[in-house]
């Protein structure tokens, strides 16, 4: 249920809840729909209700805003998300929740995500990875980032390394960088970068 290639998912309109979120938070700009997008969530999953939680989206946006650019003219400035990034990546991924009877609480509906980013999009992908691994309140979280070659894997890892190294928020949370991994020992959570060619 991540990305479907059928016609009904090509540039389909935003869910009412996400449009309401953008309007209620005063997020300016018209989101540009991607070619493919995550389908609208069902009303129920395995008999359990699904809801949109705007506070969860607020928390993620605030967390990402605590991270800072590490390169170029924006180096040292907080990450700011565009309306498109919020509407089509952050809100659908973190806002939709399903009731989990076993945990006795609402959990994120989307447990897996595929985000294809063009070149120069690694900062957003890194921020989402950091949030999923260390800011989601889940012990033992694993985020795997794949690349075709060692050089690509290194290029994927560098922005993650830089965010972790230069973020007081992540340092305070005990996040450590090691070879090709970023770990939070107290929660056993990890981000790994792997390549298909060794």
What are the residue ranges of the model-derived segments?
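Phosphate/NTP-binding elements of NTP-utilizing enzymes
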Residues: 1-198
């Amino acid at each position: 249920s991540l990305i479907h290639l059928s016609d009904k998912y090509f540039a389909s309109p935003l869910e009412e809840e996400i449009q309401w979120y953008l309007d209620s938070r005063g997020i300016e700009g018209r989101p540009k729909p991607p070619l493919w997008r995550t389908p609208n969530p069902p009303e129920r999953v395995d008999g359990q209700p699904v809801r949109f939680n705007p506070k969860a989206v607020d928390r993620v946006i605030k967390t990402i805003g605590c991270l800072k650019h590490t390169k170029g003219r924006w180096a040292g400035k907080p990450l700011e998300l565009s309306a498109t990034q919020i509407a089509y990546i952050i809100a659908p991924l973190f806002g939709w929740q399903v009731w989990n009877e076993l945990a006795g609480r609402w959990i994120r509906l989307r447990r897996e995500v595929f985000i294809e980013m063009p070149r120069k999009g690694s900062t957003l992908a890194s921020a989402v990875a950091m949030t999923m691994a260390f800011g989601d309140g889940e012990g033992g979280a694993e985020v795997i980032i794949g690349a075709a070659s060692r050089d690509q894997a290194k290029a994927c890892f560098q922005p993650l390394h830089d965010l972790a190294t230069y973020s007081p928020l992540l340092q305070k949370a005990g996040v450590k960088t090691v070879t090709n991994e970023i770990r939070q020992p107290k929660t056993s959570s990890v981000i790994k970068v792997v390549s298909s060619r060794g």
